[in-house]
């Protein structure tokens, strides 16, 4: 998003919006923000004051499909969860197949206020941040003992880079293959660390044998739970 669009959105923050629909009409009419950019901002919880991102995305898709139209096919009503009786107050006339000359803005404002979606999971939020920001910004005491998997290397004993969702720090750790294979982890997974231990680092010597490196320590996770449904 360029500086012009950022300034336009910042100016809108001076306004009071009673609903997400109010904001969408202003974004559409008063700014140069493109649809894909708006979707990204919703994904990143830029408009969280209006509700959960999944609900806002669903509302935005419907807004895009209907806001510039003046008529609706009767066959479309079921797909948007509206009966003919509910749509009737917003149309000037009706034919066998069409609802014509609709007051689409009033219709949409009413319709969007009723739309709900399954709440966004923590994993969905993390996935969006990594995709669009390139990093995770979550830092919350509620997530004590929980981490997101940033990198996975399974060449030898699985090696992970984890992001602490409590304090925003990253750490490197390992898991033995037997434990890992019982609950395989992928980039973006969320886990609660239940048990850990420290072990010396190892490296290959000149004979190709693995030996411990004196005075070193590595963190090994010995028990964890995957929490992707949060």
What are these model-derived regions, one by one?
Residues 1-230:
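Noncatalytic, beta-rich nucleic-acid-contacting surfaces in large DNA/RNA-processing enzymes
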């Amino acid at each position: 998003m360029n500086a012009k669009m950022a300034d336009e959105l910042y100016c809108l923050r001076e306004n009071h919006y009673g609903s997400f629909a109010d904001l969408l009409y202003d974004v559409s009419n008063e700014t140069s923000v493109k649809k894909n950019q708006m979707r990204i901002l919703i994904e990143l919880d830029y408009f969280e004051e209006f509700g959960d991102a999944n609900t806002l995305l669903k509302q935005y898709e419907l807004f895009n499909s209907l806001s510039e139209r003046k008529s609706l096919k009767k066959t479309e009503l079921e797909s948007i969860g509206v009966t003919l009786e509910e749509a009737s107050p917003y149309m000037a006339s009706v034919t066998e197949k069409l609802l014509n000359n609709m007051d689409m803005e009033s219709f949409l404002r009413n319709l969007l206020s009723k739309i709900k979606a399954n709440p966004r999971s923590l994993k969905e939020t993390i996935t969006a941040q990594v995709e669009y920001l390139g990093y995770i910004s979550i830092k919350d005491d509620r997530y004590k003992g929980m981490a997101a998997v940033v990198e996975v290397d399974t060449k030898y004993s699985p090696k992970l880079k984890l992001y602490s969702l409590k304090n925003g720090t990253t750490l490197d750790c390992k898991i033995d293959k037997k434990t890992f294979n019982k609950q395989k982890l992928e980039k973006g997974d969320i886990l609660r660390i239940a048990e850990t231990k420290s072990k010396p680092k190892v490296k290959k010597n000149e004979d190709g044998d693995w030996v411990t490196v004196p005075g070193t320590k590595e963190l090994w996770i010995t028990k964890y739970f995957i929490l992707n449904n949060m």
